[in-house]
Amino acid sequence: MPLESFLIASPALVGDQLYVGTHTGLIVCVDWRKGEFVWKYEAPRKMPFHASAVVSEDLVIAGGHDKQVHAVQRSTGKIAWTFATRAKIECSGALIDQRFFVGSGDGNLYGIDIRTGMEIWKYNAGRDITAGIAIGEGCLVVGEDQQNGRLLCFS
């Protein structure tokens, strides 16, 4: 199925629906069994989505090169909220309950309430966060330092 753009982000799959961000600033929902688009969300600034999308019960959430986290309604593809950072986002986020965690090129790891799109937690790592986030039993782990490979673990 042609997306008219190349992909860097990995797709998220829930049932028959596949969600992925593109290099041309789209987040798309595809019915992979039918090979048809369900919806397309176009970010206003049309900048790349290199971070993989995370899917909750109601939302599809992804960070973009436009320095924004975009949350779109899973059923319609309409924007629910955006959250601004100070640099592009290449880090794939993670969802814990009703909280979305994502790192940014501004050196911050953010915790966002997915019901409101509001910041509920922030940690300044001092350097770009580009590695994806891993969730374990009672902890969140992210690689922070591109120079020496430092891992940060939050419990």
Q: Where is each model-derived feature located?
A:
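Glycine-rich phosphate/oxyanion-binding loops and their immediately adjacent helices
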Residues: 21, 33, 63, 75, ...
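Short loop/turn segments that connect beta-strands within beta-propeller blades
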Residues: 31-35, 73-77, 113-117, 155
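Extracytoplasmic beta-rich repeat domains
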Residues: 1-14, 23, 37-56, 65, ...
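WD40 beta-propeller blade core
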Residues: 28, 70, 110, 150-152
